């Protein structure tokens, strides 16, 4: 398994995801979304699995400030890559598989 957790340091669900993998002694790589973001290829891979809507955090302040609800889908994608704080976290990848949020039932099937 090649687990990557894309998250935010203050995100409760990201901490729960890290703990879940630690308890099972599964090695993972943590990537801080606000500082590193997702590469365009990583983004496309995750979007293909979970869909665009699942990736966007509609409850964050940046969503309102950038008027995300009122712009075209293409412009939303550009903003999402430009402002990584818009991502829902944690984004957990295992090769080509991906989840958004705390999904231990799905991760257990990866083992």
Description of each model-found segment:
Residues 1-24, 28-33:
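Local sequence-structure signature of Cys/Sec-based thiol-disulfide redox active-site neighborhoods
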Residues 33-111:
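Thiol/selenol-based redox catalytic cores and closely related redox-interacting motifs
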């Amino acid at each position: 398994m090649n687990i990557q957790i894309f998250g935010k340091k203050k995100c409760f669900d990201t901490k729960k995801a890290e703990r879940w993998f630690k308890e099972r002694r599964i090695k993972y790589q943590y990537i801080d979304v606000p500082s590193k973001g997702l590469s365009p290829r990583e983004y496309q891979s995750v979007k293909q699995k979970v869909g665009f809507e699942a990736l966007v955090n509609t409850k964050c302040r940046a969503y309102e400030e950038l008027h995300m609800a009122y712009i075209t889908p293409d412009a939303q994608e550009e903003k999402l890559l430009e402002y990584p704080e818009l991502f829902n976290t944690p984004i957990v990848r295992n090769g080509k598989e991906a989840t958004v949020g705390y999904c231990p039932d799905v991760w257990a099937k990866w083992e």
